[in-house]
Amino acid sequence: MEGRLIGVGVGPGDPELLTLAAVRAIRESDCILLPNEKKEECYAYKIVRQVVPEIEEKDVCPMQFPMTKDADVLRAAQDRCFAEVRTRMMQGKKLVFLTIGDPSVYSTYHYIHRRVLAAGMSASMISGVPSFCAVAARLGISLADQGEEIHIIPGSYTVEDTTDYTGTRIYMKSGKKLKQLIDVLRTEFASREQQGETLEIY
């Protein structure tokens, strides 16, 4: 019997935001796949452990994805991870890959998900609460009303090129460019204020 792979979003950090579907999949799994080399350093694992303490007894397999833009290095890492996943699935194992937020938003899980599907094997996802939705809920604001647009902008973008976007802009993975982002938004805020326009920044 062939196994299956499930990418499980564990939310932004609050263990109370872990979904019932995620908890069930984790409890029913044979093996937990982590996007970190060590479970002690994996934020997603720490979140789950607070709700599903029995995860400590599960077989854990770290998936090592190097933080690099070198295509050859990334491809080699993906090949190794897929080979490990395929071996376990051929043994009939039910695998759960933990990922922060939602597996469909900037998640390393998809490197494996696509390979598994291409090989004709079973892969699916369980949604998690994305960080930007959690922030909006915490602030009590709407991300979009009526026909407003939402733009999700990763740190790889040139910040200056996004100031003309209409609607809501969500900047993600901007740690290395945070100072630059703040400076650009301050300049834009002042410019819009002079023109009698508003720019809400959270």
Feature roles, as predicted:
Residues 104-165:
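Class I SAM-dependent methyltransferase SAM-binding "motif I" and its flanking Rossmann-like core
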Residues 73-81, 138-141, 164-168:
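Short, surface-exposed amphipathic charged segments that create phosphate/polyanion-binding patches used
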Residues 42-44, 71, 134-136, 180-181:
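Short, charged, surface-exposed secondary-structure boundary motifs
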